[in-house]
Curated annotation (Swiss-Prot):
Heme binds at H131, Y135. This is Cytochrome c-type biogenesis protein CcmE. It comes from Actinobacillus succinogenes (strain ATCC 55618 / DSM 22257 / CCUG 43843 / 130Z). It is a single-pass type II membrane protein. Keywords: Cell inner membrane, Cell membrane, Cytochrome c-type biogenesis, Heme, Iron, Membrane, Metal-binding, Signal-anchor, Transmembrane, Transmembrane helix. SUPFAM superfamilies: Heme chaperone CcmE (SSF82093). Its main location: membrane.
Length: 172
């Protein structure tokens, strides 16, 4: 092999190694910043009721559901708050330290992002409340439809519309 080809081969190999290292670092960075979305039922039972697809303790996840009435516990000396979130199935406990959104209240839909510190306890770094009574995050809406359709619950049941509201609409 002549010297010219050797130098070209070295340059090509150097570029390939550099691109490979850069790609590996990008993939590693993306992997550590991806937060998977779960419903409380999926945290407890695993996605599609498959225990092998449960999130692991220490994993960063996002959980969406409704704040269980009567479950909000506030520490009077700090900004620590603890509350339960559920869909139709089991609940999980969310622990958060900070100022909650103005729209946060019991019975309200929320999305909490954080780290799972126990199989059913999420240490939240961020809590988001939905902005009006009919809004459901797209991911939560899809998950709720998957969970509720087999149970025979209609989409109107998921909107939170009462029987009285439905009767008033029908009478108009």
């Amino acid at each position: 092999m002549n010297p010219r080809r050797k130098s070209r081969l070295k340059i090509v190999l150097f570029i390939l190694i550099g691109v490979s290292i850069a790609s590996g670092l990008v993939m590693y960075a993306l992997r550590s910043n991806i937060d998977l979305f779960y419903t409380p039922s999926e945290v407890v039972n695993g996605k599609q009721n498959d225990a092998s697809q449960k999130p692991e303790v220490g994993q960063r996840i996002r959980v969406g559901g409704m704040v269980v009435a009567g479950s909000v516990k506030r520490d009077s000396k700090t900004l620590k708050v603890q509350f339960d979130v559920n869909d139709i199935g089991p609940s999980i406990t969310v622990e958060y330290e900070g100022i909650l959104p103005d729209l946060f209240r019991e019975g309200q839909g929320i999305v909490a992002q954080g780290t799972l510190i126990e199989p059913t306890v999420l240490q939240a770094s961020e809590v988001l409340a939905k902005h009006d009574e009919n809004y459901v995050p797209p991911e939560l809406g899809e998950q709720l439809e998957k969970v509720h359709k087999p149970m025979g619950i209609s989409n109107t049941d998921l909107t939170g519309e009462s029987e009285r509201d439905q009767q008033e609409k029908e009478s108009r």
